[in-house]
Amino acid sequence: KKLWEADEASTNASLMNLAIYSEDPDSLLRNSDAIQELTREHACRAILIGMDRGASETRIQAWITAHCHLAHGKKSVCCEQVSFLLQGKVIGRLRNTIFAHLASDLPLVFWWQGELSDLFEAALYRMIDCFVFDSTEWDDPRAGFAKIEEAVEARERIVVQDLAWTRSHHFRMAVAGLFDDLVAQRALGEVDSLRVVAHSGQRTTALLMVAWLATQAGWRPGLELDIAAERAAGCDECFMLESREGRSITVKGEWDDAGAALGLVELHAPDCLVRVSREGDASYLQQRLECPGHELMLRGPADEISSADLVADQLSRSGRNGLFRK
């Protein structure tokens, strides 16, 4: 408080509490850099927590930092950051540390990095208004999503934001944009294959993209899933879906570690091709529609690459993310 009173050129600004938690004790410096970028557009009170659960000695270390940015070339707007390194036994210390340093009248956005450990419990998530995570970081996504579902049931108004879902935002918009075309709409019921290419570390991102397409198109798991999947060749991961019309749809997942997180979404019908692609870290997506006597080629924005930029995008869009929760 005295810091802000002594500096007439700076204003302390906060629109939310933003906590970043990691069980990597070396994460504090990296996450401080992320806060520096996030506060350019999102004023907040930042709480960084690094946890070293394997330490033999139980102790807490804390640091206070201010991230300042010039507002219209005049007064600088500053956001306060409190960083904690918790070592050793952590029973009750995580939530108590957060509780004690929240701006009580502001919502809490909590970004959990890495696996959901036993510290993700009701006493913690009942404090949270928006929970940000990245399911591509989990070894067991099924178990992780079960914990998320439990949290949503216990606290209905919590907003959950998976960066694996955010990472495909512009891909989804690009595919939807191509299907605004009447020719593509007529071909949707005849789609017989879907090909998705992604980085091997982004399997969940790819599967969420497939799930979105299936939900929007009304596809369901095929009745002969296992047998049909064995017949589908030339892919790293294959399975079958069935359209509303009863048509079998082969889904082919391929991993390209030299490419983008999500590099290609391609739908085939007998006479039509709908394709959205991204080359490496290009800042744009290429959209293509090919049907007899009708061709369309467009470009659109691509999704951000870094996790911090994805979080910034998600904070800008806000909303309850109802489609993801389906």
Predicted feature residues:
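ATP/pyrophosphate-binding catalytic subdomain of soluble kinases
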Residues: 164-230
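Structural alpha-beta junctions
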Residues: 36-48, 102-109, 126-131, 153-154, ...
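A generic structural motif
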Residues: 45-54, 110-114, 135-138, 159-162, ...
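Acidic, Ser/Thr-rich peripheral helices and adjacent loops at domain boundaries
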Residues: 62-73, 129-138, 150-156, 231-233, ...
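Conserved, well-structured core segments that form the ligand-binding/active-site neighborhood
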Residues: 82-84, 88-185
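C-terminal structured domains
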Residues: 2-8, 12-17, 25, 33-35, ...
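An N-terminal, globular interaction/scaffold subdomain
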Residues: 1-111, 118
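Short N-terminal or domain-adjacent regulatory/targeting segments
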Residues: 1-14, 63-65, 165-184, 326
